Structures are given as C-alpha cells and as structure tokens.
C-alpha cells in the first residue's frame, strides 16, 4: 500500500490511498515503477490530476518493520500497457519515472499486527464484491458505466 500525492493544473494538492495484493506495485526499470489503477470512486482525482500535471509524490509505509520510502517523479498512464495482462482488475497502468527516491524517518509509525488484503483488492481467481456505496440512489446515476450496480 502507498499514498499517492498529485496536484491539479492550478497546483491544488490531493492525496489518495492505493492498495492491492502483495506485488501490485512493480519495479519496471532502474528509476521506474508501475501500478494498476483499479475501479475507484469515479472521481478520477489521481488520474485527472496526472493528466494535467504529471508531478507525483508517493509514500510507501511498511507498518511491520517499520520503514518509509518516498518516491517523487512524473507519472503517465495507459490502457494498452503490457502490464495490464499481469495485474487482474487493472483498468489502466500508471508508470512513474522517479526523480527522487529516499528513505524517510520511521520513528512515529504505529505498529500494525499483520494485515490481509481488502476483499475488494483485485487478484487472479477472485471477483471483488460491489461496494455498498455504489448502490446508493444518490450516486448510481453519476458513476462511470463499469462502476454502476447491476
């Protein structure tokens, strides 16, 4: 899991939690990483921001060790990336060309006693359930087609 910081065209920041099963973030080159964009809340805050301002900040936190790692760089995304076939549930692949990678002081990280991936995390052989909030009357009509209830 990690936190992804983006900013819109006017520089207004946004931060999102990104999660998946172990290995959903891939190191794809000496200074490049990639991760899938899964079905979300339909607001496209991260991807919308990346489309107009590719600068991103990523904070990885290992609550068990504890350790933190920061990655700052420029992101792009594609729906025809070869990694799509390797990451079940991916709607797009986001690639980040790292400009800075550095550890961050872990002294205030609280400890977590083991964790399992969310039941909503896409993976091979598992169909995530539809989140209850996507069935609420006040959001159904504004969700993208793939996100709407059946």
Describe these PLM feature segments.
Residues 1-150:
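Binding-site signature for planar aromatic cofactors or substrates
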């Amino acid at each position: 899991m990690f936190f992804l910081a983006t900013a819109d065209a006017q520089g207004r920041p946004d931060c999102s939690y990104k999660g998946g099963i172990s290995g959903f973030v891939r190191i794809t080159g000496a200074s490049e990483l990639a991760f899938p964009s899964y079905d979300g809340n339909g607001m496209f805050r991260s991807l919308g921001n990346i489309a107009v301002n590719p600068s991103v900040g990523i904070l990885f936190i290992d609550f068990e060790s504890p350790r933190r790692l920061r990655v700052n760089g420029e992101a792009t995304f594609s729906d025809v990336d070869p990694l799509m076939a390797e990451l079940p549930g991916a709607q797009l692949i986001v690639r980040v060309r790292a400009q800075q990678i550095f550890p961050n002081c872990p002294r205030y990280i609280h400890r977590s006693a083991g964790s399992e991936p969310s039941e909503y995390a896409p993976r091979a052989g598992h169909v995530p359930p539809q989140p209850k909030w996507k069935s609420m009357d006040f959001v159904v009509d504004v969700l993208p087609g793939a996100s709407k209830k059946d």
